[in-house]
């Protein structure tokens, strides 16, 4: 299964999250997932909130348009971005 795909106007991402990183970044493929490093710690939902904010900024959408569909409490997540205005090059290159 792909790490990144389109479903209608939405963008779906299968992610592996690295919390408490030195900076926010899209690292690249990690097996069949896209590895994303974020600075927030994995405590009390801070990592999910930070991930949503980071992806919203990259795709030029509101934070509410980034939905964690699976993996709320783990490092492996599936995220839906509703009607992204922009898709970063490192993500666009992986769309199947």
UniProtKB/Swiss-Prot annotation:
Q: What InterPro entries would the database entry show? A: DUF167, YggU-like_sf
Q: Which sequence ranges form a coiled-coil region, renumbered to this chain?
A: none
A Gene Ontology cellular component where this protein is annotated is: cytoplasm
**SMART domains cross-referenced by the UniProt entry:** DUF167
Q: Give the stretches traversing the membrane.
A: none
Superkingdom of this protein's organism: Bacteria
Query: What family does the database annotate?
Result: Belongs to the UPF0235 family.
Q: What is this protein called?
A: UPF0235 protein VCM66_0443
Query: What organism is this sequence from?
Result: Vibrio cholerae serotype O1 (strain M66-2)
Instruction: Identify the taxonomic lineage of the organism of origin.
Output: Bacteria, Pseudomonadati, Pseudomonadota, Gammaproteobacteria, Vibrionales
């Amino acid at each position: 299964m792909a790490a990144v795909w389109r479903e209608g106007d939405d963008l779906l991402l299968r992610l592996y999250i690295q919390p408490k990183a030195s900076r926010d970044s899209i690292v690249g493929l990690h097996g069949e997932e896209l590895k994303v490093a974020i600075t927030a710690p994995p405590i009390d939902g801070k990592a999910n909130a930070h991930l949503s904010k980071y992806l919203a900024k990259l795709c030029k959408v509101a934070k509410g348009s980034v939905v964690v569909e699976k993996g709320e409490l783990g490092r492996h997540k599936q995220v839906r971005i509703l009607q992204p205005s922009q898709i970063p090059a490192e993500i666009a290159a992986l769309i199947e």
